[in-house]
Amino acid sequence: MSRAKVGINGFGRIGRLVLRAAFLKNTVDVVSVNDPFIDLEYMVYMIKRDSTHGTFPGEVSTENGKLKVNGKLISVHCERDPANIPWDKDGAEYVVESTGVFTTIDKAQAHIKNNRAKKVIISAPSADAPMFVVGVNENSYEKSMSVVSNASCTTNCLAPLAKVIHDKFEIVEGLMTTVHSFTATQKVVDGPSSKLWRDGRGAMQNIIPASTGAAKAVGKVIPALNGKLTGMAFRVPTPDVSVVDLTCRLGKGASYEEIKAAVKAAASGPLKGILEYTEDEVVSSDFVGSTSSSIFDAKAGISLNNNFVKLVSWYDNEFGYSCRVVDLITHMHKVDHA
């Protein structure tokens, strides 16, 4: 079977890391990149050098006005309007929409206008696009779907863990907190915020309470949990890696040892590569560059009794998520060409 040909719109943190993930996983071919704010030479520099993930482990250069990455040529475009990006010229069927701007079906379909591309994968939650978390509900994808969402990095961490716990012990209700590294939407120093006032406070100086729809979104990918989970976030002064705290009430009583055993079995079985299990004395920096969606920290969780537990799971909110974008495209291509 041929491999999926991919275009990337928006060459920010996720766009660049999807490119890295594509070359690491080697299951799709990136053939085109569009960003109106970054020229070709600057793209080379930004691919090569990353303050968090280090130097790109390969060769990056230019050739005849194109990017050349590990010997493969990638076309570069600088269009502001998605409808004007010539994805078809490069053979890009699947477009990763990673600008953070075109996150609804209507806006994202501009990539498909005039038969430019065939499918769009939004690298963010969407108000109306079907949402998928690899390892949880990707098998509900149908080839008739033209625009889909890869959900959020936090939903990708929480949903696999919640699935294991709910399938085995039944989650009656739960609250999630994500202790989340700062992102580009925050301020380096205090400044005005277009949303909540405290979102505008200096990211590297503060622990900032914030909202997140990640827990509620689990109900979209696991319908049995719809209305049973909600959550909030604390933005903290670290550049990458975040951690989910899921506190939940169980319908079927279980000791913490039984819960650990269930997660460990899933991590080495049906969710291998998605959910990971560790009993090491870990801290956040240990997971920079992790390709897993969710790393269960067996030593960090606690239980009050057999029906009330706190579970802890880590995730590289940048690279782990980017790997799932590539995995989702790979799955879509397989279904589309079955």
From Swiss-Prot:
Please list the GO biological process terms of this entry. glucose metabolic process; glycolytic process
Catalytic activity from the UniProt record: D-glyceraldehyde 3-phosphate + phosphate + NAD(+) = (2R)-3-phospho-glyceroyl phosphate + NADH + H(+)
Q: Name one GO cellular component term.
A: membrane
Q: Where does D-glyceraldehyde 3-phosphate bind?
A: S152, C153, T154, T183, R198, T212, G213, R235
Pfam families listed in its UniProt record: Gp_dh_C, Gp_dh_N
TM ranges are none
At the top level, the lineage of the source is Eukaryota
Its Enzyme Commission number(s) read 1.2.1.12
Which pathway does the record list? Carbohydrate degradation; glycolysis; pyruvate from D-glyceraldehyde 3-phosphate: step 1/5
Residue numbers for the site described as Activates thiol group during catalysis?
A: H180
Localization, per the record, is:
Tegument membrane
Q: Which UniProt keywords apply?
A: Glycolysis, Membrane, NAD, Oxidoreductase
Q: Does the keyword NAD apply?
A: yes
Principal localisation: membrane
The record's active-site residues are C153
Instruction: Please state what class of enzyme this protein is.
Output: oxidoreductase
PROSITE patterns linked to this entry: GAPDH
Similarity comment text for this entry: Belongs to the glyceraldehyde-3-phosphate dehydrogenase family.
* Function of the molecule: This antigen is associated with human resistance to schistosomiasis.
What do we know about how this protein assembles, alone or with others?
Homotetramer.
Name of the molecule in the record: Glyceraldehyde-3-phosphate dehydrogenase
